[in-house]
Structure formats: C-alpha cells, structure tokens
From Swiss-Prot:
Membrane topology term: Peripheral membrane protein
Biased segments, Polar residues type: 223-232, 290-303, 383-395, 469-478, 618-629
GO CC annotations on file: membrane raft
Biased composition, class Low complexity, residue ranges: 22-33, 67-93, 123-193, 206-222, 233-275, 401-417, 424-440, 503-517
Compartments reported by the entry: Membrane raft
Keyword hit for Membrane: yes
Annotated stretches, region: Disordered: 22-671
Entry's family note: Belongs to the AIM3 family.
Organism: Debaryomyces hansenii (strain ATCC 36239 / CBS 767 / BCRC 21394 / JCM 1990 / NBRC 0083 / IGC 2968)
Alphabetically ordered keywords of this record: Membrane
Pfam families listed in its UniProt record: AIM3_BBC1_C
Name the UniProt record assigns to this protein: Altered inheritance of mitochondria protein 3
Biased composition (Basic and acidic residues): 41-60, 479-488, 571-593
Biased composition (Pro residues): 558-568
Amino acid sequence: MSFWDNNKDTFLAAGKATAKGIGTGTKALGKAGYRTYKNSQGERRGVPDNEADKAERSSYETRNNTNTSAYSGAYSGSNTGSNTGSNSGTSYYQSQPRHVDVNAYPLPPKRVAGPGEVRPLGHQDQGQQHQQMQQPQQHYSQNAQYSQAPYQPQQPQYPQQPQQPQYPQQPYSQDTQYSQAPYHPQQQIQPQPLTEGERPIPTPPTQAGTQPQFQPQLQQYQNGHIQQSHPAETQQPTYQVEQQQQSYSTEPQQQLQQPIFQPQPQSQDPYQQSPEANDSNQRPPAYDDSQLQNTQQEPTQVDSEPVKKSLPDPSSFAPPPIHKNRGVSEPSDSASYKKTGVSGKPSHVGKHGTSTTPKPTTLDMDPSKIGQPPPKPYRENSETTLNSASSNVRQTPPLPTRQSSNTTQNQLQTTSTPVPPPRSNTASVNSTSSQASSLPAPLPLPDNTGSEGSQKKAPPPKPIKKPMQLTSDGSSRNAEPDTLKQEPKNYMPNFAEEIALRKNTNSSLSGKGNLNSEDFNSELNSKLEPVNFENHAKPEPSDATPSLVKPKPKVMPKPKIGPKPSISPKPETKGKPIIKSKSEIKAKPDLKPKPIIGTKPVTVFGSKKIGNDMPISDSPSNLHVNKSNTPPPPIPRPRSAASNTSTPPPPPPSRNYRRAKAAAPPIESGPPNLDLQLSTGWFATTSGPMVLPKDLSGLNYNTSYSYVTRGSDKSHTRNINLRLRDLAIISYAITWSNDNINNAKMEVTKFIPSPISNKIPTVDELVANQNRFGEYVASWSENKMGQKVGTGECWDLARDALLKGCGKHAFVSTYYHHGYPIISLQGSENGVSYVDGKSPLDELRRGDILQYTSCIFKDKIRGSVSTVGNPDHTSVVLENTGDKLIIAEQNINNLKIVKKTEICLQNLTQGIVVGYRPMPAGWGGNL
C-alpha cells in the first residue's frame, strides 16, 4: 500500500485534533475574558480578586456537577477517530455561568494536603481550571505522562509545571496509550479492580477515605472510554497520579485494539525504556526514585509481555550448515570441528543458557564426503581417508597464507636460478633439476604430523607447475599428495614460467653462437619433457583423484604448442633486414641527413624481432657497434653550420602606423564644363530678360549684346559674366552671324577660380579681418534690435550688416557665403563632428556670421528641441561665452524683426552649421 493509504487515518485524526484544539483554545480564550470580566465586577463590588475567583469557581463547579452526566453521555456517543491528547478546555463545555452572588455560596473547606496525598476533587478542579485558563492549547508529546499534573498550590510534592506552554502543538505525535479521559464525577460507573501493574501510589491514612471515592470510577471510566473508539479528548485531567497509573493499565489493551492511532511506531512504546532513562527525562520533581521506578517498571512488564515471545530451545534447531570455505576463512573453528566433530560457530546459542553441543548426527559425518570445498576434484583423497580412518579426527589446517608463502618461496627459488644465462644447456638443466630435487626437503614435515597434511588438503591452492617443470627426480614426484593438491591452484602461472624458461634458454643458446632451429626445438622439448603429471599422480592411491587431476595437467600441451618460435623461417623470409642495404644506397646523395633517415629504420627494432632466431642473433651487436661508430648527431651539424654561416636576412623595417592624410584631389584650375544649350537660342534674346539654361539658372550674372554689320552680313556677339556657386567667376562670349543661331559659337573669355579653395587665409589674416569688420557687423546688428531689416528675411540682416555696416569695404554676402568659412560642424545623435574632418581655422568671434542648413538642436538638460533652418537660416554672432553663443537673428517664428537669442552648438543633433569670417571686398573678385 502507498504511504497515504497507511497514514491517511493518522492525517485525518491530526486534522480533526488541530481543528478541535483551535476550537477549545478559542473557548478557553473566551473563558479567560469572562473571568477577567468577573474579576473586574468583583473589584467594583469590593470583593477581592481571590475571593471572587474562588466564588466563581465554586459556583461553576456546582453547576458542573449537575450537568456532567448529560455531557458524559454526549462524550460516550461521540467518536472522532483520533486521540489528540489535548488537555485544555473540554471541561468548559457547559454554558457560561450566570451572574450570581458569590457570597451566597459557602467557601470550600481549606485543608493542607500532606506529602504523598492527593487533594480532593473540588480543589483539583479549581487548580485545573486555573491551569486551563493559562494553557489553552497544549498537545503534549511522549513525555506528557508527567507534564499533565494539575496545578496544586498547597501540595509541594506535585507542583504545577508552567513551562509546558513552550512545547509546540503536537496533535498526532502523542500515542493512544497516553489519552486522558475526561472526568465526570457523577457518571454512574461501577468500580473496577486494579490489574497487575496498576497499584496506586500509597497515600497517608488521612486521605484513605477520600482517595478511593473517585479512583475506581476513574479507572472504570477510562477503560470504558478507551474501548469506545477513543473519542476526542480535550479535557485536562483533574487528578495526578491515579490518572497516570490508569493510563498505564490500559496501554497494552489499547495497543491491540486500535493500532490505527499509532502514527509513529518508534515512539509507541516509550514505557519500555529503562527506569533510569525515564527518571532522568520525565520524572516530576516531587517523586522520589523508588516510587517512580515502581510506577514505571511495572507498566514496562505489562507492555512487554504481549510483544516479546519466549525464546525457543536452541537444541530444537538443526545444526548450522557447513560452509565450503570454512577451513580457509576460519581455521580455528575448523580445527575444533575436526577434534570434536562439532563446529565451534554456534556458540551464540549458549547465551540463552542452552548447551553448545549439537546433535550427535554431525559426529558420524564422513569428513571425506564433506571434503574441502574449493577444488571439487580433490574432495575425495585416498590419503585423507587413510588419515581420517587412522586418527578419526580432523586436524586444523594451517593458514593458507603460509602455504602460499611457501609456494611463493619455492617459486622464487625455482625461478631465480634460471634467470642468469647458464654456461651450457646441460648445466642449466642440471641446475634446475637439482633445485627441483631440493624442493621436497621441506615437504616431509607434513608427514610427521599427519593432521597437518590433512589440514593442508583443506584449503588446496592452485597447482604449482614450477617444480613439475624443473624437477626431473623421482623424489619430487613422490612428494606427498598435499603438495600435489596445492599445485593445481597455481596452474595458471606456469605459462609465464615456461615463457621465462624459453627466454632463458634462448639467451643461453644465443651465447653459444649459431644453432639450428632443430637443435633449439630438441632442447626445448627435452626441458619440457619433465612436465609429466602422470608421475606426480602416481602417489595418489584413490581412484577418483588421479582421473580428476590428470585432465588439468593434460591441458599443458599448450606450452608444447610453444614451438611456434621454432618457426624461424619467418624472420628469414623477412627480407626487411636485407632492405637495410637501401640505407647504403641512400648514401648516393651527398646530403648526409638522408642516410640518417635511412639508418633509423635499421635500428634494433628489426633486430629484436630477429633476436629470437638463433642464426641472426649476432646482428643486434653489430648494429649497436655501427651506431656507436657512426653517431647521428654529427650529421645534422653541417646543416646547422651552413645555416650559421649563411647571413641572416635583414630585419624587416619597422612598421609605421602613422598614416598621412590623403591628398585632396587636384582642384581643376580651369573653367567647369557647363552645358549652355546653345541650340535653344536663349542668347539671341535682345528684348526682355533671358531665360538661362539649367546650369546657369540662379547664378548672379551680367551680360552685354553687340552686333556688327558688313554689307548684308550681320555678326552678333553675346557676352555674359557669371559667378558660380563656389564664388568663382566665368565669362562667355557667344557669336553667330545673321539670324542663324544654329552656327553659334561659344568661347570662355575669363575665369577666376573660387577664393574659398584658392585663397585660404592664415590665422593672422582671419584675426585681422575680424578686428577690421567684426565690430561693425555686430554693432550694426545690435542697433537694429526690434526692427525689420530689408525684406524681413534672416539673410537680409547679414547682407545689410556687411554692406551698410562696413561701408562697402567688406565682401558682401553672395549666395550663402558671407566670407571665408572658418568652421563647419555636422550634428548627429552621437555628437557634433567636423565636416570632412576639417579642423576649424579659428574660433567664432564677435561679428562672425552663422549659416544653418536643416539643423535641429536638442537640449538634454531642459528637454527642449528647436529646429533652425528650413532649409536655411542666417544669424550674426554677438558674443561667444564658451558654452553658448549669443546671436542676433531675424524672421524667427515668422516674426520678421531682429531679436537676440542664445544657441549651443554642442546640442546640434542634425544638420550643418558653417561659421564665416568677414573678408575684404576684393577677396571674392568682381564680375
């Protein structure tokens, strides 16, 4: 089932408990307010707070006693399905008390309870009510069994615990066995005798008459209440010790009846803890250790009885199975088993007081059948059966590490001798045979102790093929079967040994000189002949073991396949060393590096492959000598020497990243090629204005017409002087005869290039011209403030200022040129830049004239935008303050009078502004 299916009831109970706790808390809060109101009323009537409180409580208890039975029926019929453990507010389920005279009721009797006594129910109710007013929502956790005692101011043994409000609300963390049934004093319930573990705490004789009056009823009611599906319980108990004991008595029964109210299994048995832990964590300060242990140990016994089961008799269990690796991993246990026939492992059964001796069925077990598990072929061994029959007791086998260490020592002894090349083949064979014969010396030790022989048999290692290969005597073959069983474990490393043996024999044979491959194969086979497993298997008298042992050594023909190295013709067929002559052929070129490259393939790599072949064994030494005689390093030296002797190329010249400005295109000094459209005959007009062609329209010009008659022939001449847009001057003479305009001829009689591009003044000249004309132009413009100049156009102000202000001594405005342009600015969104990259010749000064072309100024600080020039506009500079210019202009917003304004050229975002410096009249020439 899913987690939700298992715990949905718990979550539902928690939700209900939370809602109920909120309701009870709200009720308790209302009660507290009502109580405060009663206290204030008592103060008005002159009744002290304590007396008013007691009177109100006593009156409330009286009504509570009369109405408890009705509410108890409602309680018994309700089933919320949860046990919240709430201890606040349930006893106040009755209606609000009415205003009554507190003095009309007698005061309750005052009595000081002695040590270990429980106060009467009435006093406990008062203390309980006081505590409930202070603790509206207290859902106790596991330690609520001691924290639920009511406040009793006159009983120091059971003081109130005001620290409980710090615990958070835990509606479903409390187990069902902690539920506190609401107490109804007048409910008719028969007393029930206490069960075992439910005896109350002894009290003095003074309360012997009062204590039993409600304790049986409480016990009976609680048991009945718990069996009624545990309705929601939110009332805090009005009793202290007996309530706890009664909850203990119903704890086991409650666990069996309602496991659904146990969301936390790990915390459902808190009473099974040791009394010491409970004393340290949950003991109230009024209890002493003895009483608390008595009240907690007994519930522990009652709680543990249905949970714990009696331990079964260990003798009823079958003996533990024998693990196949028992002898290897646990030598001490296997030894005890061999001596007594019983494994020492199940000693844990003795913890329960039962005998550790197992059933006698294991004593008659045949050790030969059990065998040692690792190698199945060696389970049955004749020698082991003889040893078991003679001694009838299994000896503890030695540690496998010792055997492996012995075998490794033997391996080191056998492999260390053939490593140096023997003087002769016979000597090497004899040395190996003598070493192999020396191996069995330590082996007879297991014979003296037959038990050790059987023990070694228990963890048989893999076979060791080293002594089998190197031994030629019968003594090694007659070794004990224990070693024969150990050898199969080391079966695999023999391939490496055989390979090492071949290498050693090859090295020994290579020392002799030239040998035939047949001799090598015969010697190799002679050395491999001692590996005869049949001789080793002879000492084993059993029938199954030799058949099982023989197949493994029979796999050894694989080393016999080793004659593959005898296929020496392959290196013979390898004409690759013969190709070495190519290196000699490569000596033909004078360049020595090529032989070096040729010698590299002649390195020992080829000789190593041939090193296994006997006839070519001398070649590596020769190659090595040749390499020593002709070292490759001196060969590349000529290259380095040649490179050193050759003069290095000169360093490249340093790069110069400074780029000179591109030269301006050559200015055509000659007249421009204009289309005069002579075919139209515009020049033949003698009466009225002439209609100039397109290239000449809009230009300033003057013209003259003349004719000459010679008899019947009449020659006509038209002279026209033009000022071009760049202030250049050109003159044309057009002639034709009679009235035939088709034969008209044109001739350029005069051309004066533009002064802007051909007469560039210096800074001193510019400053001098400003001093000469600037003040006149500016002052004349200032005098015209508020007046209309000329036709009221902006251009008229600049023209008249130059013409009239300077007395015809300055160059008068022509087209949109008012002198020499000293600065040209172009605006964009990224800022202001100079047109064509031309830096200004001088700063703007007083008397200079500005010409605007479709300009837009945006003041980012003020947020204003102004358009100047649509498409052109002209103004006169009166003052330059650095960041702005004060100018005089006309025809602003169709207001055709002169005004003074300010402008900032840094705010230019679109258009072009050109500043002109007044120049002399002869600067531009005359038509």
